[in-house]
């Protein structure tokens, strides 16, 4: 429960922080900031994500006590990569001071981007260690501290020094400070670094994580390339419009999806450990039903409340383009979430992850074709359509690999069909209400949408959610006295 609370807090505060920074920087500088942030995320994925995946999969409370050399090896690997990236940042900063000492220079922003990647990697790695040990309280505190430092440092920096490079550095500092504050709870007893054993383990970790990292890097490169394409085709203001819509949408989907994944994937891993591969794949089938049943209505509901959110929380300079880009990006964001949290676990359990890379490459290719064709037909909005088409193509390929062939998975078609029908019915009811007065529209759409979809879930027990709710919150029967 603490993990879910942490994700809710993180999502809400990230939304607030993104809006504050967008308002203080303005569309053009926010576009530069978003582009650099996307670059930092890509760097983090390429260099540090395998450590996070390995910690989540192979580190535990038992390993912490019985095999401390695993943590020692992971720490050393992070330290080596971080030092190299800091050295690169120092080189860029030094060249920037010699060539163009202004904070708007490309070298300055590149240096800040590298340091931001180090900060993101440091936080994500330690958060994964806390989750792997199932210490929810420690994880919750870590997230809270990160957001407190983020709000104070990043919002304060954007107010006093409204330039992307300083806000990026403030973000890196916020993530590092959260780890420093929680260092006692996250610390393990010193482990002996055993070179040969650690090398074997790191090879295992790399073999497990690299295919997933490659796919994630491709998916993160797509919006990075697309933001650059919009800036080149129009200007940085247009890139800022696109970035805000993409960032707010992706944060919502990824927060819910990641919270589900933390709970559901571990159930599949546990099923494999205790009952074998067949039981694990049966659990994956149930997980897919749950993920679709929760993400699909969220996608539909987000579209329904977009006009109200635009008027109530989006800075005035971004209004208009925000609603347009959001509507075009939602299908792609939904497809990406389905891949990450419903389809990828199939291949993770099987430890055959090449289809994940193939799907990502197809998505990138479709996105590239769209970039070449659609902007001439639709203007900058065509770039958002290209991104959604690329992600939809990737999801279709991955689903096809799961559904066909000798190892095809039995899909929960009943749950998927009922979720789709209920979401469509909800959209039909909410669509006429979208353009009411914003506060009224938001209140009615959220309340009515939850009530309608929740009623269908309850009546038909979609994905077993009714049973889960009654087991979790139902009244406990009194135990008879012996």
PLM region spans:
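Interfacial segments at transmembrane-helix termini and the short loops linking adjacent helices
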Residues: 96-112, 302-334, 338
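Interhelical loop/hinge segments that connect adjacent transmembrane helices in multipass membrane
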Residues: 137, 164-166, 180-223, 263-282, ...
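Membrane-water interface segments that mark the loop-to-transmembrane alpha-helix transition
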Residues: 1-14, 36, 45-97, 110, ...
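Signature of the first transmembrane helix
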Residues: 1-52, 89-92, 116, 151, ...
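Membrane-proximal transmembrane or re-entrant/amphipathic helices at the cytosolic face
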Residues: 428-482
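Hydrophobic alpha-helical transmembrane segments
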Residues: 107-114, 140-190, 208, 246, ...
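Helix-loop junctions and terminal segments of transmembrane helices
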Residues: 48-65, 131-132, 245, 249-288, ...
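Membrane-interface junctions at transmembrane-helix termini in multi-pass inner-membrane proteins
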Residues: 119-142, 331-362
């Amino acid at each position: 429960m603490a993990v879910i609370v942490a994700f809710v807090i993180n999502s809400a505060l990230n939304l607030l922080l993104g809006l504050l920074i967008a308002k203080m920087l303005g569309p053009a500088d926010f576009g530069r900031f978003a582009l650099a942030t996307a670059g930092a995320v890509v760097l983090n994925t390429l260099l540090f994500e395998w450590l996070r995946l390995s910690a989540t999969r192979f580190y535990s409370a038992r390993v912490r006590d019985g095999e401390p050399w695993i943590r020692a090896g992971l720490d050393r690997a992070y330290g080596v990569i971080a030092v190299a990236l800091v050295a690169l940042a120092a080189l860029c900063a030094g060249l920037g001071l010699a060539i163009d000492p202004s904070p708007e220079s490309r070298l300055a922003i590149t240096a800040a981007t590298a340091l931001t990647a180090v900060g993101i990697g440091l936080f994500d790695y330690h958060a994964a260690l806390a989750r792997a040990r199932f210490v929810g309280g420690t994880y919750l505190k870590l997230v809270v501290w990160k957001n407190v430092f983020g709000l104070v440092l990043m919002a304060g920096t954007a107010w006093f020094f409204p330039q992307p490079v300083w806000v990026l550095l403030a973000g890196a500092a916020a993530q590092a400070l959260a780890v420093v504050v929680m260092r006692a709870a996250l610390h393990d007893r010193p482990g002996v670094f055993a070179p040969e054993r650690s090398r074997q383990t790191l090879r295992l970790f790399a073999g497990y994580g690299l295919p997933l990292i490659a796919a994630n890097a491709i998916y993160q490169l797509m919006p990075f390339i697309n933001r650059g394409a919009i800036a080149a085709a129009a200007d940085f203001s247009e890139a800022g419009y696109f970035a805000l819509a993409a960032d707010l949408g992706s944060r919502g989907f990824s927060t819910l999806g990641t919270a589900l994944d933390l709970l559901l994937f571990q159930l599949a891993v546990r099923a494999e450990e205790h009952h074998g591969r067949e039981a694990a794949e049966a659990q994956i089938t149930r997980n897919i039903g749950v993920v679709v049943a929760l993400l699909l209505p969220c996608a539909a509901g987000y579209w329904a409340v977009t006009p109200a959110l635009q008027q109530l929380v989006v800075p005035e300079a971004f209004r208009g383009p925000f609603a347009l880009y959001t509507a075009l990006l939602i299908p792609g964001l939904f497809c990406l979430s389905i891949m990450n949290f419903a389809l990828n676990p199939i291949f993770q359990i099987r430890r055959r992850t090449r289809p994940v890379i193939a799907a990502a490459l197809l998505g990138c290719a479709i996105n590239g074709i769209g970039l070449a064709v659609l902007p001439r037909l639709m203007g900058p909005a065509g770039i958002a359509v290209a991104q959604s088409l690329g992600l939809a193509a990737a999801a279709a390929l991955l689903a096809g690999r799961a559904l066909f062939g000798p190892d095809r998975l039995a899909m929960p078609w009943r749950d998927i069909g009922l979720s789709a029908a209920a979401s469509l019915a909800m959209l039909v009811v909410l669509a006429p209400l979208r353009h009411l007065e914003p506060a009224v529209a938001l209140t009615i759409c959220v309340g009515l949408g939850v009530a309608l979809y929740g009623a269908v879930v309850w009546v038909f027990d979609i994905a077993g959610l009714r049973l889960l709710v009654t087991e979790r919150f139902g009244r406990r029967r009194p135990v008879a006295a012996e």
